[in-house]
């Protein structure tokens, strides 16, 4: 993997000023695994904060995101291209309270590499890389753990201070398809997770479900780490092997979907068979703070998908009209329902495919048919404003769903019959 020129240019500027810029975290981990990454995270040593800030401003647009401990997002410029890198001083953390927020963090450019790496969660994330010399600095043997596909904590004394690391262990196990070290697993089980806010939990769940080719690994890890017991008791009674298989299938099937719909399908599969029904699903969504994403009502769709689970199979056993399919699209996206049911019941794929073919033929895979008759049409015909307009348009729309109204002329004629 080649470090991009804007990053090298920044590292040279730091070196010329008397400092040293090292890549840390995910970029280094991916580089050593032979994977590409644009996740540039640089730690700068031996430069005072004011000097670093001034230097960064010569390289690009600087946005401070952690002024207390000197963290910057820098949009680096090079010729006509640009990229964003996170640049920070090494950080010294002091524990002052419970949970993942109970820290005072200060930048310290004169820490040793080992001191700086010790605050990181896992050895595979505690490796430093010098882009100018190609030197790999590995104070905690993270390379060996990478080779052994092992997730191992850096320092038992500090690891337990940040409860979010338990969920990070889960999502890294899934994304990297690594095994969690038994001692690390034991430390994770001792950590209370109830201090974690919903937004931070969702951040790790999103990485687990949407960035892992095998989410099943994370699901089984969540059980062993104590996450199910503490945060998601609804999943404790589930057949995790079957559920994990469904998630793995859905990860592939949702690849063509946009982000909000991918979230919707993956979470709906998790919630589909909760024994306590919709109230349990609502509580689960609350714990993830899932509502609307990119103006798409994820929460409503998930609840509707769970409500209509098994519907393609029950409909295969009776006569179903085109109107039934169109009305279904008023309540849930039939295309998403097909994906959820296909991943959950892969042995019934032919039934789901027939269901999906039907909704596509009718043009209601995503949305119901738009109404032909609108209130403005009735006003143009001289109908007085009032609630009766809504009653008429709704009645005509029902006829449209049943194929008894095919165009605007039909709709207006039907409306006149309701007025008389």
Where does each model-flagged region fall?
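Catalytic cores of the polymerase beta-like nucleotidyltransferase superfamily
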Residues: 1-420
């Amino acid at each position: 993997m080649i470090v991009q020129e804007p990053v090298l240019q920044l590292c040279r500027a730091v070196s010329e000023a008397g400092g040293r810029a090292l890549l840390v975290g995910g970029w280094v981990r991916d580089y050593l695994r032979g994977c590409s990454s644009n996740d540039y995270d640089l730690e700068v040593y031996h430069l005072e904060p004011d000097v670093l800030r001034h230097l960064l401003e010569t390289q690009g647009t600087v946005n401070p995101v952690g002024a207390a401990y000197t963290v910057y997002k820098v949009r680096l410029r090079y010729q006509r291209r640009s990229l964003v890198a996170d640049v920070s001083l090494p950080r010294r953390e002091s524990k002052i309270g419970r949970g993942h927020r109970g820290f005072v963090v200060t930048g310290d450019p004169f820490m040793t590499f080992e001191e700086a790496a010790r605050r990181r969660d896992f050895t595979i994330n505690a490796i430093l890389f010098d882009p100018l010399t190609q030197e790999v600095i590995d104070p905690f043997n993270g390379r060996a753990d990478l080779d052994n596909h092992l997730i191992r904590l850096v320092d038992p004394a500090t690891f337990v201070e940040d409860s979010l690391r338990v969920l990070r262990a889960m999502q890294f196990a899934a994304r990297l398809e690594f095994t969690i070290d038994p001692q690390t697993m034991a430390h994770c089980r001792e950590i209370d997770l109830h201090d974690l806010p919903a937004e931070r939990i969702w951040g790790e769940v999103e990485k687990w479900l949407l960035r892992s080719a095998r989410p099943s690994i994370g699901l089984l890890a969540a059980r062993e780490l104590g996450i199910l017991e503490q945060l998601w008791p609804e999943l404790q009674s589930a057949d995790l092997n079957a559920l994990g298989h469904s998630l793995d299938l859905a990860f592939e099937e949702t690849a063509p979907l946009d982000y909000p719909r991918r979230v919707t399908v993956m979470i709906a599969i998790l919630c589909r068979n909760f024994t306590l029904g919709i109230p349990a699903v609502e509580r689960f969504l609350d714990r993830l703070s899932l509502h609307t994403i990119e103006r798409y009502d994820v929460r409503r769709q998930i609840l509707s998908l769970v409500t209509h689970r098994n519907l393609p199979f029950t409909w295969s056993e009776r006569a179903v009209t085109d109107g039934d399919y169109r009305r279904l699209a008023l309540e849930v996206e039939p295309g998403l329902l097909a994906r959820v049911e296909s991943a959950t019941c892969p042995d019934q794929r032919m039934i789901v495919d027939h269901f999906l073919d039907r909704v596509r033929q009718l043009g209601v895979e995503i949305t119901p048919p738009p109404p032909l008759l609108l209130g403005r049409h009735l006003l143009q015909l001289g109908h007085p404003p009032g609630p009766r307009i809504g009653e008429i348009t709704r009645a005509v729309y029902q006829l449209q769903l049943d194929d008894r109204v095919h165009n605007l002329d039909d709709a207006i004629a039907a409306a006149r019959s309701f007025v008389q």
